[in-house]
Amino acid sequence: MEPMESCSVPPGFRFHPTDEELVGYYLRKKIASQKIDLDVIRDIDLYRIEPWDLQEQCRIGYEEQNEWYFFSHKDKKYPTGTRTNRATMAGFWKATGRDKAVYDKTKLIGMRKTLVFYKGRAPNGKKSDWIMHEYRLESDENAPPQEEGWVVCRAFKKRATGQAKNTETWSSSYFYDEVAPNGVNSVMDPIDYISKQQHNIFGKGLMCKQELEGMVDGINYIQSNQFIQLPQLQSPSLPLMKRPSSSMSITSMDNNYNYKLPLADEESFESFIRGEDRRKKKKQVMMTGNWRELDKFVASQLMSQEDNGTSSFAGHHIVNEDKNNNDVEMDSSMFLSEREEENRFVSEFLSTNSDYDIGICVFDN
């Protein structure tokens, strides 16, 4: 059988029909012996030709092909049997998975069977890279498959393992995966494969370059804005402060800016720190005293219960309430004195530094 003349189609012509077109147009017209507008699919005796010879026999035009299409007539393996003969001189075609229905919109028009070519003889054949889709007309999905009659076939080579999933490097628009244990069809349409793998791609957190750059910019922005200036707050006890005119309130985490205060400001600031230390020490002493009073109170309660009973417990309770009231009054007086001292310090500091702007900063640890 001579190969088809390459001049039968114009240059640049590429034949890539869908499943619906193969079954609904080409195969239907072939079975009905009707004329096909562009006769580019050859009749091939699939069981007398090896798959690697299809490239020359089913060549269309001058363009490089990754898929080869042909019509084939199925014959029974035995005259009285029901199995189809799928053997060649070098090997045999073995069906894998389940047949897939082909629909024209919502109407069932055919079925697609997937086969893999094995070199040698069953059951010791060696699996090759050649895959074939065999299409047949069918109106009932549950009907037994036809073992005789015309079918249209698409043959292609299996995509190599580890090959980049690029449309330009795919050996075919259909590719083959290993047979699953549950018997699901191992040859998948690229669209089905992409939709199946979409959730895995995003579940792994893969991002494009623009998304990664956006994340880096966001991190850099956060790092360079650790200290954010707040708006001025109005207080009845403090005068309004001027908004800083310099970059005193903005500090970068990567660059340490040291602002040198004048001598008078330094002394005032140091006195303020010393005052804060004194107040902390006073609070520690007060808390220590309170804990001591609590210890005394618990001890007295235990002693009174053992010696005098519930009557002495009431007396101790009254005495301790008086002590607690005295402590509250002492704490209130100390708090008021500390507040007056702070107000006085701020007033002195503002009066001596009227020419300078002060900013309020929030330091995030």
Curated annotation (Swiss-Prot):
Leader sequence segment: none
Keyword line: Activator, Cell wall biogenesis/degradation, Developmental protein, DNA-binding, Nucleus, Transcription, Transcription regulation
A GO term from the CC aspect: nucleus
GO MF assignments: DNA-binding transcription factor activity; sequence-specific DNA binding; transcription cis-regulatory region binding
GO biological process: callus formation; cell wall organization; positive regulation of secondary cell wall biogenesis; regulation of DNA-templated transcription; xylem vessel member cell differentiation
InterPro entries: NAC-dom (IPR003441), NAC_dom_sf (IPR036093)
Protein localization: Nucleus
Family: Belongs to the plant vascular related NAC-domain protein family.
Assembly and binders: Interacts with NAC030/VND7.
Protein name: NAC domain-containing protein 37
UniProt gene name: NAC037
